[in-house]
């Protein structure tokens, strides 16, 4: 599951659980689906999902605003909506950027 530019799918996650945890393929698939369903259910209710050393998924409300049709330039109202946001932890940011000092401190001011 490593490599530049690869998209990791549900099947890849299930296979990783199968190989690393030792569950059957059916159990691994059920486990991955259960975790994803729980995260989805929490987000639908507007709850924040915080995974230590990984990051937080949260739902934010966006108010109505005026946008523009790029073809015509006409102003168009954009309805209020909820959007899902992921905020990576400092540890994940460090791992992605190759800073593996492991203390969890963020080296860049956000």
Curated annotation (Swiss-Prot):
One of its GO terms (molecular function) is DNA binding. One of its GO terms (biological process) is DNA recombination. One of its GO terms (cellular component) is cytosol. Keywords: DNA recombination, DNA-binding, Transcription, Transcription regulation, Translation regulation. InterPro entries: Hist_DNA-bd, Histone-like_DNA-bd_CS, IHF-like_DNA-bd_dom_sf, IHF_alpha. SUPFAM superfamilies: IHF-like DNA-binding proteins. Belongs to the bacterial histone-like protein family. This protein is one of the two subunits of integration host factor, a specific DNA-binding protein that functions in genetic recombination as well as in transcriptional and translational control. Heterodimer of an alpha and a beta chain. This is Integration host factor subunit alpha. It comes from Nitrobacter hamburgensis (strain DSM 10229 / NCIMB 13809 / X14).
């Amino acid at each position: 599951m490593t490599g530049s530019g690869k998209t990791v799918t549900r099947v890849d996650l299930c296979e990783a659980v199968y190989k690393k945890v030792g569950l059957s393929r059916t159990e691994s698939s059920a486990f991955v689906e259960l975790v994803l369903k729980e995260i989805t259910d929490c987000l639908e209710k507007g709850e924040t999902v915080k995974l230590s050393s990984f990051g937080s998924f949260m739902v934010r409300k966006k108010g109505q605003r005026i946008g523009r049709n790029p073809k015509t330039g006409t102003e168009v109202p954009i309805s209020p909506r909820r959007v899902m946001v992921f905020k990576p932890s400092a540890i994940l940011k460090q791992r992605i950027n190759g800073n593996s000092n492991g203390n969890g401190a963020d080296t860049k001011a956000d």
